[in-house]
From Swiss-Prot:
Pfam families noted in UniProt: Laminin_G_2 (PF02210), Syndecan (PF01034)
Protein encoded by which gene: nrxn3a
Biological role: Neuronal cell surface protein that may be involved in cell recognition and cell adhesion.
Protein name as catalogued: Neurexin-3a
Keyword Disulfide bond: yes
Membrane topology per record: Single-pass type I membrane protein
Every EGF-like domain range: 194-231, 658-695, 1073-1110
Biased composition (Acidic residues): 1446-1461
One example of a Gene Ontology biological process annotation: angiogenesis
Renumbered residue ranges of the record's region Disordered: 1345-1366, 1442-1479, 1520-1557, 1665-1697
Length: 1697
């Protein structure tokens, strides 16, 4: 036997047998330690122990992760406990407030909860938290107590200094891991002294100490004293007392009568057979607890009882002998009795004679009651006279009862939690050792629950803090029927919050109007305006009881105790009782479902909220602390419940932060800061911002008089309290701001502009529900002159009958008359009131802007915009937009109309907008009785307001800084108030005039607009200057609150009057309408397309629509639940593309989601996905190899603002741009494909095809074609990444899918939470087939469109086409460019073959492909004079060949060219150009606008007779793919082998060294390049549009398979050929023009002999398609050294050939 191991084995045996009785005595010697099995405290666990020591510095326990980062060390430092721990190298320290080196016993606990660690000392907890990346603690070592072994290597210690710390000296006992004793592995120099507790003898007067269940027990048998510590004198009965105490001590030494109660357990002793009848008695017991409240002992009923309880940490005694209660409270001097230490209680009642004063000195018998705690604190008193006997035949309850709240005289409602020991009742007749009787299971003693007959640690009911109003926890159903009780403590500094709520099953009840309403039984406690309220409904109506007189939001703890028995009950707040009685006769409270603590869940669809519960209606969640929740006397561990539910915003502690939270000025943008509970509260009302710190800009809605936003409630709403706020801006004096409306009643709460003031109308339809007293609508007014086009803030607060309206700083208050206070509504409407059935007078529609509409805590505009609510209808436009409502154009000065008489007798508010280039003209005139009249006119460009109220005419002239006939919109406001103050305001300039005398304007007859009738000009009053009508546009006409429709409401119309105001004037030319592209012609980066008579805007890549790209595109809102819009191409129309263009506008607050995804046919795996990840937007696509991602990584886009994202792909190259931010580009790595292209053009024997393919794969080739696109899905819910927010103006390769969805396209399905904003777009604005009919700047290089089979055959055209079709074959759709399986046509590239089907139809006007191929540029430029006619001719003859095959390919194929359009550069407003960006090597992209892949070259606008100028290009050159040097110039070399599969043309000649700058600055005088383009075909007139586009970096050339074809045909691409006669004429003209041009070319070359030459750099050429193989221009990485800054002079009228 190994004798050295014997002591350790003996120690282990002792520790195993004795368990918690074991005490570890540490001597403090160096080298001592005790080693326990590892404590798993990685995430959640508790460790507890008791200790005492007298040293000021010592190590108590330590463990770590083996030498890396994590450790935990508990020490005594300067007499206090110090906890130091680290998680993932994030370290912190916690120090106790109390000193522990006092040689007294202390209890310590360590609680681990993920990143938080709590140190508990004698019931006081302190905690700390770290913020590492890892969320848990790593633990490798075992746990060491008192020290660590000295032979442990320092390298394995995370905290090496632990070896040098002083060892612990003292005793440690009751070490437990989660209430279980750990295994002692080994120890050194530690004594396992069971009697260590008695080292310092607590027994007095010679008593002997022993340990029982870990506690000291004094044997007083050899002394003359008794008591726990032998400190009380024994009875003077010789010998008997000593015998009794000796026997008792022996019994205690054997087994002590102690029990643990956890809130649900209690003893019940039946007194029915032996009733108590005594005049003197004594109760003794000891208790130990952490709990503040709990029943200790009770006996008796009705008015004869004794109740002993713990109340708020003090001992409470209530005795009633029949004539009234005697109450006594014993409190310690410092602290509370709930300190988890043993306390002895002794209650005695003795019959005494008491001399009564005032009773003639007659001695009476009274009961003297004495209560003492720990033998020191004593309270003495007398029970009331007449009754001296305690009689009880009921039960003796110990530790609790079945319903503690219902016990007579009980000051608490919950049972005891802790340990009770030696509970003894005795009187002159009996002695009941209740604890012993329970332990031995006496027949008369009933034990409820699982009682443990030893003292165990009872987990404390830790408080929790609700840190945000949204935080809440759900509790199980409250099983209460006839009676029940709830108690809790709360602490807060905030005035409002819902604390408790639960309700029962919905029931149909009939109200006073005999209509069925859904009602429920419910119970609630709320904090409102600092007062506590109890609300109860048991089926017969709601009662609302105010339980406090003073405010209770002062940060102190308040104890709430609610007890109910049937209909009656009491609510106590800090012992102040308030009785209540429920309505009706029902005594059953029928509840169902969860009880909510602290607030309500976001999804409240299943909850029926009572109207009387104002905090629920107002969305006021509770912020503060809750502790000690007891339901029906049983404790609820709300901390554990909160942790299990993982409730957000809940913290397991309650500490009040020091200082004021607003001292740091956290509220931005002038938000008002208020102090909350450990938080600041920012009131953002009136700022235009929202969020916790008022940092996020609130969404703005713009209204034009016909627009609205309507929030439809999911169910009918009933409220008695409302908080409403909003901001508005308007130039009108009238208009609906906000209104609640009902489908069933006239109930409304309405805010509107009325005479430039805000009017509040509250109408509670009392008559409809048979109310006794009804006054009708209540109204309030506030504010003055609010139609000043400035932001104003409106607030409405209603609480029952009282209500208040605040406009800016103007406050108006009112009190409602009548008993009815409930508001019913189904909708919240803005802008236009659509629910009009119960409205006698419909309010005027609103024109202006609304922002920050907040109704009962919900920001409805932003919720609607972000898709957070599904019940929102709107057609108002988001954003601060210029509002031009219902414009009408008067095209001549003889045009006018008349309306009904203007009603402006006492006051007047007129508003209109106008736009004109004429300096004079009548705008408005109305005559009246006598000399009364009103006139508004434009005189020499200034507004005149002329009027006569009977005292003679007056004129007020506008004081504009400049004349107003500048073709810009101007705003005019004319007002006359009750004081006869007339004001004329034009734009921001106002003029006022006070007119004395008559105040009324009595008008008669028609109101004339924009002019007068015949002969009326001769009879105009004085001061009226105009003698002709108004020519221009009028809009937003407001006639004293009436918004007339000028055309439909007109009584008479004369002349040319049209709806709308589309005729515009440019800045440079105000003499007539603009017909040429200007810088500001197209908004939002739209592309201006010049035509002969006018211009149009291509808005495809803007997300906008309209004639000038300034109207929002079709918009859908995707809601919270996730929605999906899916488009499926028909099986025979699935396209394959080499280039893709995608644009969409969006706004969202989402961090992750898929916006759009395009997938190929099943089995192919190609896809393209636009998605948001971590708030950043990007595109990921796969076209045959690996995923390629392009991302905007610099800035997050989930800020709720509107963004436009543009994506283009050309092969493996891609660009992504958000708004006008920097462009993100991707260029694939790897070698050039020149070798591959060359090999593709050779005849490869079949047996070598596979090795060649494998070799290409080894060379890292990338595929370039997006094959067989089958589906477009929008919304992402099909891939578990749903998008939430707005999507607008989606454009993908010609498809406007959202337009198609709005028009009900049969190929589109809509599922889930998807809502269309506004009206369905007009027909024709969306495509219903695979590709669009117009593609002016929307070129798609389509390779496979009609089929997915690999068989080469002609396909039947789609049914929508009735003309000649050119159809592409479905070559190799499953693999982009496999040479072996799919060998291409001779000269072709990988199956990129199309077979034209040409049917000549001489009856149709000729049409040209809507997309034009690019023309490569040689280094010289030829210029000739241009006229309109020559332009038309040049476009037919100026492009002699669009093939590279030489003159053979330019024969009859071009006979039928009808390309008489011009390609002209232009640029939409808002485009960004940056010449400093680095050049790229993607030859298929544009020179300047890298997001557009059009086949056009940019030039600028005409001046006068289309004068063209030489370009101002950058310093880099365009380069063809293959070049040869010829002196100083370089020209393209064409390969005849590729002539059958590519299309180019003889290029125009540009100065060498002038092209291919990375970001070319657009100039207004770039040369014109005639290129074939599209027609707008009708049977009456043929238009030849001039197409303009941005300065493209480089454009991929189209790849038709036959010469003469201008583009790649898609599924809907049509090439129409006219008759052969027309073709012959065109051919002759083309040949003649060619000869002239060659002559001019030679002359120009001779004149420009000093031009530079090209350099060729093919290091970064990746994609070499057919365009580059045939002369398409390339980009260079180096700048030309000669002509970088050279400018071309051109003063002649010229254009390019």
């Amino acid at each position: 036997m190994n004798f050295f191991r014997f002591p350790v084995q003996l120690q282990l045996l002792i520790s195993t047998v004795l368990g918690p009785c074991l005490g570890l005595e540490f001597t403090g010697l160096q080298g001592q330690w005790a080693r326990y099995l590892r404590w798993d405290a990685s995430t959640r666990s508790d460790l507890s122990f008791q200790f005492k020591t007298d040293v000021s510095t010592a190590l108590i326990l330590y463990f770590d992760d083996g030498g890396f980062c994590d450790f935990l060390q508990l020490m005594v430092v300067e007499g206090k406990l110090q906890l130091q721990f680290s998680i993932d190298c994030a370290e912190t320290t916690v120090v106790s407030d109390k000193r522990v080196n006092d040689s007294s016993w202390h209890s310590a606990t360590l609680s681990r909860y993920n990143l938080r660690t709590v140190l508990g000392l004698d019931g006081v907890s302190k905690w700390a938290e770290v913020r590492p990346l890892r969320q848990y603690m790593k633990i490798v070592s075992d746990l060491f107590l008192g020290g660590v072994p000295q032979d442990i290597r320092i390298s394995v210690l995370t905290l090496p200094t632990v070896k040098d710390l002083p060892p612990f000296k003292g005793i440690i006992r009751e070490l437990k891991y989660n209430s279980k004793e750990p295994i002692l592995l080994s120890s050194q120099r530690v004594r396992m002294d069971i009697e260590g507790i008695c080292m310092e003898n607590p027994c007095e007067n010679g008593g002997t100490c022993s340990v029982v269940d870990g506690e000291p027990l004094c044997d007083c048998s050899k002394t003359e004293y008794v008591g726990r510590f032998c400190n009380e004198e024994a009875n003077n009965i010789p010998g008997f007392a000593h015998m009794m105490m000796a026997d008792q001590a022996k019994g205690k030494a054997r087994e002590e009568n102690v029990a643990t109660f956890r809130g649900s357990e209690f003893f019940c002793y039946d007194l029915s057979q032996n009733p108590i009848q005594s005049s003197s008695d004594e109760i003794t017991l000891s208790f130990k607890t952490w709990q503040r409240n709990g029943l200790i002992l009770h006996t008796g009923k009705s008015a004869d009882y004794v109740n002993l309880a713990l109340k708020d940490g003090a001992v409470s005694l209530v005795i009633n002998l029949g004539s009234g209660a005697f109450e006594a409270i014993v409190e310690p001097v410092n602290g509370k009795f709930n300190d988890n230490s043993w306390h002895d209680v002794k209650v005695t009642r003795n019959l005494r004679q008491h001399s009564g004063i005032g009773h003639a000195m007659v001695n009476k018998l009274h009961c003297l009651v004495t209560i003492s705690v720990d033998g020191i604190l004593t309270t003495t008193g007398y029970t009331q006279e007449d009754y001296t006997m305690l009689g009880s035949d009921d039960f003796f309850y110990v530790g609790g009862s079945p319903s503690t709240a219902d016990l007579p005289g009980s000051p608490v409602s919950n049972n005891f939690m802790g340990c009770l020991k030696e509970v003894v009742y005795k009187n002159n007749d009996i002695r009941l050792e209740l604890s012993r009787l329970a332990r031995i299971v006496d027949p008369k003693m009933k034990i409820q629950g699982d009682v443990v007959f030893k003292c165990e640690n009872v987990a404390t009911l830790d408080p929790i803090s609700f840190e945000t109003p949204e935080a809440y926890i759900s509790l199980p159903k409250w099983n209460t029927k006839r009676m029940g009780s709830i108690s809790f403590d709360f602490r807060t500094t905030e005035p409002n919050g819902l604390i408790l709520f639960t309700h029962g099953k919905p029931q149909e009840r009939k109200d006073a109007r005999s209509q069925k309403n859904t009602k429920v039984d419910f119970f609630a406690v709320e904090l409102l305006d600092g007062s506590l309220y109890l609300l109860l409904d048991m089926g017969s109506g709601t009662i609302k009881v105010k339980a406090t007189q003073n405010k209770v939001n002062d940060g102190a703890w308040y104890h709430v105790d609610i007890q109910r028995d049937g209909r009656s009950g009491t609510i106590s707040v800090n012992s102040r009782r308030t009785p209540f009685t429920a309505s009706g006769e029902n005594e059953i409270l029928d509840l169902e479902g969860d009880m909510y603590l602290g607030g309500l869940p976001d999804s409240r669809g299943s909850l029926i909220l009572p109207t009387e519960l104002w905090t629920a209606m107002l969305n006021y969640g509770y912020v503060g602390c809750i502790r000690d929740l007891f339901i029906d006397g049983r404790s609820k561990d709300i901390r554990q419940i909160a942790e299990a539910q993982n409730g957000a915003g809940i913290k397991p502690s309650c500490n009040k932060m020091s200082g004021k939270q607003c001292d740091s000025y956290p509220c931005k943008n002038k938000g008002l800061c208020k102090e909350g509970w450990n938080r600041f509260i920012c009131d953002c009302t009136g700022t235009g911002y929202w969020s916790r710190t008022c940092e996020r800009e609130a969404s703005i809605l713009s209204y034009d008089g016909s627009m609205y936003m309507k929030v439809v409630m999911p169910t009918v709403m009933h409220t008695e309290a409302e908080d409403v706020s909003l901001r508005f801006m308007s130039q009108r004096a009238y208009g609906l701001l906000m209104a609640t409306t009902s489908r069933d009643s006239a109930d409304t709460l309405r805010l509107e502009l009325d005479g430039s003031r805000v009017k509040l109308t509250v109408n509670l339809d009392c008559i409809r529900i048979n109310c006794n007293s009804s006054k009708g609508p209540e109204t309030l007014y506030a504010g003055q002159k609010l139609n000043d086009n400035e932001w104003h803030t409106v607030r409405v607060i209603r609480r029952g009958k009282s209500y208040k309206l605040t406009v800016d700083d103007d406050v108006a208050e009112g009190q409602m008359v009548g008993d009815h206070t409930r508001l019913e509504f189904h909708n919240i409407e803005t802008g236009v009131m659509t629910e009009r059935r119960f409205v006698s007078m419909i309010p005027s529609s609103f024109i202006g802007h609304l922002q920050s509409l907040k109704f009962n805590g919900l920001l409805y505009i932003d919720l609607c915009k972000n898709g957070d609510i599904d019940f929102c209808e709107l057609n108002a436009r988001f954003g601060m937009r210029s509002i031009i409502a219902d414009p009408v154009t008067f095209k001549s000065k003889n045009s006018y109309l008349s309306l009904a008489t203007l009603q402006a007798y006492t006051s007047m508010h007129l508003f209109f907008q106008f736009k004109t280039t004429s300096a004079d003209g009548f705008i408005l005139f109305n005559s009246g009785d006598g000399s009364d009249f009103i006139a508004v006119e434009l005189v020499k460009g200034y507004i005149h307001y002329v009027f006569n109220l009977g005292n003679g005419p007056n004129v007020i002239k506008g004081n504009s800084e400049r004349a107003l006939h500048d073709n810009q919109w101007h705003n005019v406001v004319i007002t006359r108030d009750n004081s006869n103050v007339h004001t004329l305001k034009v734009d921001a300039k106002a003029v006022s005039q006070v007119v004395n005398g008559a105040k009324n304007l009595d008008l008669k007859g028609d109101l004339f607009i924009a002019g007068l009738g015949p002969n009326m000009y001769n009879n105009l009053p004085k001061l009226v200057a105009s003698r002709e009508g108004f020519k221009g546009c009028l809009a937003s006409v407001d006639l004293n609150g009436r918004l007339p429709d000028l055309i439909n409401d007109a009584l008479f119309r004369s002349g040319q009057i049209e709806r709308g105001c589309e005729v515009g004037f440019t800045k440079a030319d105000l003499k007539g309408p603009s017909t040429t592209c200007q810088e500001d012609s197209c908004a939002n980066m739209g592309i201006c397309i010049q035509q002969w008579e006018n211009y149009t805007c291509d808005c495809s890549m803007t997300s906008y629509t309209g004639t000038h790209c300034n109207d929002p595109g079709t918009t859908y809102i995707f809601g919270k639940g996730g929605g999906l819009i899916s488009f499926n191409w028909p099986a025979n129309e699935r396209p394959s593309t080499r280039t893709d263009r995608l644009t969409v506008g969006f706004s969202t607050s989402l961090k992750d989601g898929i916006l759009i995804r395009i997938d190929s046919a099943p089995g192919l795996g190609d896809y393209l996905m636009l998605h948001i990840e971590q708030g950043k937007i990007g595109v990921t696509f796969n076209i045959g190899t690996a995923d390629i991602t392009v991302q905007e990584s610099s800035t997050a886009v989930n800020d709720g603002k509107y963004h436009v994202v543009r994506f283009t792909r050309n092969g493996g190259n891609a660009t992504l741009q958000v708004d006008n931010w920097a462009i993100n580009e991707h260029f694939p790595s790897g070698n050039s494909d020149n070798e591959r292209i060359q090999m593709a053009n050779k005849k490869i024997p079949f047996k070598y095809a596979r090795p060649v393919e494998e070799w290409l794969q080894e060379k890292g080739r990338q595929l370039t074609i997006f094959n067989t696109q089958a589906t477009i899905t929008i919304g992402g819910s099909d891939r578990k990444r749903p998008f939430q927010g707005q999507l607008s103006g989606l454009y993908y390769n010609g498809l406007k899918v959202l337009n198609m969805a709005a028009q009900g396209n049969p190929n589109i399905k809509i599922n889930g939470s998807v809502r269309l904003v506004g009206e369905v777009p007009a027909a024709g604005s969306a495509r219903t087939t695979a590709l669009p009919p117009e593609m002016s700047t929307a070129f798609i290089e389509t390779t496979t469109t009609m089929s997915t089979t690999t068989t080469r055959k002609h396909r039947t055209p789609p049914t929508i086409q009735t003309t000649d079709d050119m159809v592409s074959s479905a070559e190799c759709s499953s693999d982009d460019e496999d040479f072996a399986e799919c060998e291409g046509h001779a000269g072709g590239l990988g199956g990129e073959l199309v077979f034209p089907v040409i049917v000549k139809d001489p009856l149709e006007l000729p049409s040209v492909a809507t997309r034009t191929p690019s023309i490569p540029f040689p280094p010289t430029l030829t210029i000739i004079e241009t006229t309109k006619e020559s332009l038309s001719m040049a476009t037919e003859a100026g492009v002699p060949c669009l093939s590279d095959g030489g003159s053979d390919d330019c024969g009859d194929d071009d006979d039928d060219d009808d390309d008489d359009g011009l390609m002209i550069s232009g640029y939409g407003s808002g485009e960004a150009y940056d010449s400093n960006l680095p050049p790229t090597d993607d030859e298929d992209f544009y020179t300047t606008f890298s997001l557009v892949t059009d086949k056009t070259l940019s030039s600028s606008t005409f001046e006068g007779g289309y004068k063209a100028h030489a370009p101002k290009w950058g310093s880099k050159d365009f380069r063809p793919n293959k070049v040869f040097d010829s002196g100083r110039t370089t020209t393209a070399s064409f390969s005849p082998k590729l002539s059958r599969s590519t299309t180019t043309s003889t290029p125009p000649k540009l100065p060498a060294g002038k092209m291919n700058h990375r970001e070319l600055k657009p100039q207004p005088d770039i040369v014109l390049l005639p290129l074939p383009t599209s027609y707008e075909v009708d049977n009456t007139k043929m238009k030849s549009p001039l197409i303009t586009s941005p300065m493209f970096r480089n454009v991929p050339t189209a790849i038709p398979t036959e010469p003469g074809i201008r583009r790649v045909p898609g599924a809907s691409e049509v090439v129409r050929e006219s008759s052969s006669t027309t073709g012959m004429v065109v051919g002759i003209v083309a040949a003649a023009a060619l000869c002239i041009l060659i002559l001019l070319y030679a002359m120009y070359k001779y004149r420009n002999r000093d031009e530079g030459s090209y350099q060729v750099d093919e290091t970064r050429n990746y994609i070499t398609n057919s365009a580059q193989s045939n002369g398409a221009v390339m980009k260079d990485k180096q700048q030309s050294t000669k002509s970088g800054n050279k400018k071309q002079k051109n003063k002649d009228k010229e254009y390019y050939v």
